[in-house]
């Protein structure tokens, strides 16, 4: 049986890419396809010789770095892959790649990290950001209308959806009219020993954020709150918001940029608590922090409501506002001594890689049996 694994973009290593890496472990002989590939960022995980890319890879670098330039071409790029020889297609998608066209008798399973955010949930935000006058604003609206119509059509090409959380499952039902299976993403819970050979070790305890620095992650709220609280905060991650956030931050906030896994885990192990200020469909970083016995302060929406247990593994704040987040930090600080690292670690065991592999394999076998491919 020939298997194709396909992912939206292999240009940076975030939570979705970690899931895709685990899918590769389950299907080591599968061929890999993606719309765009960055060897510098992803070559360590996916060698260039193993990757099939779309025609977008030949576009100028400035276009490839800014996806808004690529929007009109992305549906066609997804449909351009020749998958006629594959019996099983597994897409890992939060945008366009689920729209690939497989042969009629092939089984297409989509592990959906999120329906396309900017064209559905964040449509008004996206249009509001296009401050280019009436004609360009109208063009952006027409383009979004086309992309939403294409996205609905692309969802019909998927035989089976898997959602990464109840939050995502609800959105798949709402936007695509499909009933998905829920399989939580795999989280690395195994590395409990982290060697303290790291230089520049913080001399005081600190709060921690591990995140891509993009607008929807709401890191700006945390920066403003910690400016006000004057508590130590370390932020690990890279993204287009980094320079702006650094300008906002006072001396109690430190940005470390991208860091390798061993160093990230060291900071998890030694932090007071993890701060998760945005709404995400699942959110792998909070689970990683909890696997080290550290409590989490999270916004009370999205996937965090499925992973954080209030008063047991962390706390919530209710409004996307600086004062609400600051109040949450104060509460968490007062209650830190009441959290048991052992209890927190136990609570996240259900998100292990082993559990993900068992559940995913079982679902694939059932799907193939239903289709008559086994």
Question: Which stretches of residues belong to each language-model region?
Answer:
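Acidic donor-binding loop of glycosyltransferase active sites
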Residues: 269-281, 294
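A charged, aromatic-enriched C-terminal amphipathic alpha-helix characteristic of glycosyltransferases
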Residues: 320, 338-372
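Active-site donor-binding segments of glycosyltransferases and PAPS-dependent sulfotransferases
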Residues: 26-98
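Conserved acidic donor-binding segment of nucleotide-sugar-dependent glycosyltransferases
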Residues: 257, 310-311, 315-322, 330-337
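Nucleotide-activated donor-binding/catalytic signature segment of Leloir-type glycosyltransferases, i.e.
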Residues: 243-265
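Short alpha-helical donor nucleotide-sugar binding micro-motif in glycosyltransferases
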Residues: 266-271, 360
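Conserved donor-binding/catalytic core segment of Leloir-type glycosyltransferases
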Residues: 200-217, 223-234
């Amino acid at each position: 049986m020939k298997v194709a694994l396909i992912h939206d973009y292999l240009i940076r290593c975030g939570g979705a890419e970690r899931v895709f890496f685990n899918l590769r472990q389950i299907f080591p002989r599968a061929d890999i396809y993606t719309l765009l590939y960055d060897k510098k960022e992803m070559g360590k995980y996916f060698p260039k010789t193993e990757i099939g890319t779309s025609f977008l890879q030949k576009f100028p670098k400035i276009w490839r770095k800014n996806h808004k330039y690529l929007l009109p071409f992305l549906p066609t790029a997804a449909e351009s892959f020749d998958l006629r020889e594959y019996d099983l297609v597994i897409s890992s998608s939060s945008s366009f790649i689920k729209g690939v066209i497989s042969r009629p008798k092939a089984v297409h399973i989509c592990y959906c990290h999120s329906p396309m955010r900017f064209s559905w949930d964040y449509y008004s935000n996206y249009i509001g950001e296009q401050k280019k006058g009436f004609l360009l604003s109208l063009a952006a609206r027409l383009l979004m209308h086309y992309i939403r119509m294409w996205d609905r059509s692309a969802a019909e090409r998927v035989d089976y959806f898997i959602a990464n959380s109840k939050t995502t499952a609800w959105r798949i039902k709402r936007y695509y009219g499909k009933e998905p299976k829920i399989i939580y993403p795999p989280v690395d819970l195994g590395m409990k020993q982290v060697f303290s050979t790291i230089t520049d070790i913080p001399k005081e305890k600190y709060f921690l954020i591990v995140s891509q620095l993009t607008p929807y992650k709401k890191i700006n709220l945390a920066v403003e709150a910690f400016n006000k609280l004057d508590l130590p905060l370390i932020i690990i991650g890279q993204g287009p918001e980094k320079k702006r956030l650094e300008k906002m931050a006072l001396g109690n906030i430190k940005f470390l940029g991208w860091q390798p896994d061993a160093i990230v885990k060291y900071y998890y192990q030694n932090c007071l608590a993890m701060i998760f200020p945005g709404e995400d469909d699942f959110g792998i970083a909070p689970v990683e922090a909890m696997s080290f016995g550290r409590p989490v302060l999270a916004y009370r929406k999205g996937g965090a409501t499925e992973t954080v247990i209030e008063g047991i593994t962390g706390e919530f704040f209710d409004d996307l506002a600086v004062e609400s987040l600051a109040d949450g930090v104060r509460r968490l600080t007062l209650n830190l001594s009441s959290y048991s690292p052992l209890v927190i670690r136990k609570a996240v065991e259900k998100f292990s890689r082993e559990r993900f592999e068992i559940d995913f394999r079982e679902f694939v076998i059932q799907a193939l049996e239903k289709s008559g491919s086994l």
